[in-house]
Design a protein with these regions (language model features):
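Short acidic, glycine/serine/threonine-rich loops at helix termini
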Residues: 68-70, 168, 205-207, 251
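Core beta-strand elements of the Rossmann-like FAD/NAD(P) dinucleotide-binding domain
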Residues: 28-30, 182-192
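Conserved N-terminal/central alpha/beta ligand/cofactor-binding core
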Residues: 2-11, 21, 27, 47, ...
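N-terminal Rossmann-fold NAD(P) dinucleotide-binding loop
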Residues: 41
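Conserved beta-strand-loop-beta-strand element in the redox core of flavoprotein oxidoreductases
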Residues: 166-187
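Glycine-rich loop(s) and the adjacent beta-strand/alpha-helix scaffold that form part
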Residues: 192-250
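Beta1/beta-strand and adjacent pyrophosphate-binding region of the FAD-binding site
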Residues: 24-38
Length: 251
């Protein structure tokens, strides 16, 4: 048997072969649906839930954290707890693991309570100073999951890829998510939607204007902008980590 290769035909074929319903299952109605479970999405969902909103956080991977998860292994960067907004970043600090940049911060102000806590952790676990491509434990996937899983008003949907949006005029009223393991589809309804996918996936599906690449110097006046616009974007790194186990192991 040769399966079809057209998108719509293949979708129907898969649905029939898996015995899935034709219409998506109702996942509920929310005040806010956050799509994307990286650091931005996690912080957005946590903040809204703590302010009393009923929130759904949809993440297409089995772990949270995005780049700052054990799947990708990019360390958190950026200064927080700085004047004139010393509380800006508290949620990131609560959610994220202690790492390289925390060490740098702590050395700048070694007398503060926060700095002493950071130095104590890094003294006990020196491997945490490895910024990128460190051991899986550096990225504390379990900490992120526990924080969001146990948050009141927050509903977590892992392994779910948003594949479509429904609109009323120019307003998004629902998104369709597909479980990447079972193939089953769900519909999420809400008053507000936050696109934290990192690639603007929800905006694209909704038909929003978008642009890729670099603007020209004539448009922006930026001294380092190219003379003409182009399609260059930031690169992506594939992080990896290896250790000598002194035993033969399967890859």
């Amino acid at each position: 048997m040769l399966p079809p290769d057209g998108k719509e035909e293949l979708t129907v074929f898969r649905r029939n072969m898996l015995g899935l319903p034709e219409n998506p299952e109702d996942a509920g109605e929310f005040d806010l649906v956050v799509v994307g479970g990286g650091i931005a999405g996690c912080c957005t969902a946590l903040s809204a839930a703590r302010l009393g909103c009923k929130v759904a956080l949809i993440q297409n991977r089995p772990v949270l954290g995005g780049n700052n998860s054990s799947e990708v292994r990019v360390g958190l960067s950026g200064l927080i707890a700085q004047q004139p907004y010393p509380n800006l970043g508290n949620l990131v600090d609560e959610l994220g693991p202690v790492g390289h940049w925390n060490n740098w911060e702590a050395k700048r102000d070694s007398s503060s309570v926060r700095s002493r806590q950071i130095m104590k952790i890094l003294h006990q676990y020196p491997e945490k100073t490895i910024h990128n491509a460190g051991p899986a434990s550096n990225y504390e996937d379990e900490k992120k999951f526990a924080l969001l899983q146990n948050q009141e008003n927050l509903n977590l949907f892992l392994n779910t890829q948003v594949v479509d949006v429904k609109k009323n005029g120019n307003k998004i009223v629902s998104v369709i998510g597909k479980n990447i393991i079972s193939g089953k589809e769900y519909i999420f309804k809400a008053q507000l939607f936050s696109d934290c996918t990192g690639d603007g996936e929800v905006g694209f599906l909704a038909g929003a204007d978008y642009r890729m690449g670099r603007e020209s110097k004539e448009e922006t006046g930026e001294p380092r902008a190219p003379l003409t616009s182009d399609l260059l974007v930031m690169g992506t790194s594939v992080q990896w980590y290896a250790e000598d186990t002194r035993n033969v192991s399967d890859f």
